[in-house]
Amino acid sequence: MHPDPAPGPTTSPTTSPTTVPLRSERLDLLPIAPEHAGELAAALADPALHTFTGGHPATPEEMRARCARLAAGSPDPAEQWGNWVLRLRADGALTGYVQATVGPDEAELAWVVGTPWQRRGLATEAARTLLAHLAATGTTTAVAHIHPDHHASAAIARALGLHPTPHTHDGETRWQATLPRPTPTT
């Protein structure tokens, strides 16, 4: 089991903001690693999760390759990839993931929670923790691209303070929010 870190974001000058573990009220957000592949593939095995995003449930082997690629980080030095699996502390279940593609001022967010754990507020809780972490590390704008018929993701975006814009990309609406600037510590 993991030691209990303090709630909220923590980084040091030598730690990338996209590779630190995070903690919310009920979840440990752990940087993605290939060893999460089997649990993550099982958690996300419901084909209904792909209704709005396309694709199919990944096999454990496909998920291992994906986790390794994501853990390696972006090949573009102008952006960082942050990918965290969500571990429910109450029972240890790996329930999904959140991710952020972080550029100089903007982070694009995504969240997926497996069907058995939906409607419990876990995606909102995890994404809110991620947003607080990104704001604390200097990100000023958060965006998410959401299919117009994906009402559950739109509700999460609203709960996070994101608002739909008139812009679309690949048929998805761009949602956006300005994040608060970090408060300087003295």
Protein language model annotation of sequence segments:
Residues G55-P57, I146-H150, A154-A157:
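Catalytic cores of transferase enzymes with a strong primary signal for eukaryotic protein kinases
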Residues M1-T115, A132-H133, T137, H145, ...:
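GNAT-family acyltransferases
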Residues R119-A136, H151-A159:
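Conserved acetyl-CoA-binding loop-helix of GNAT-fold acetyltransferases
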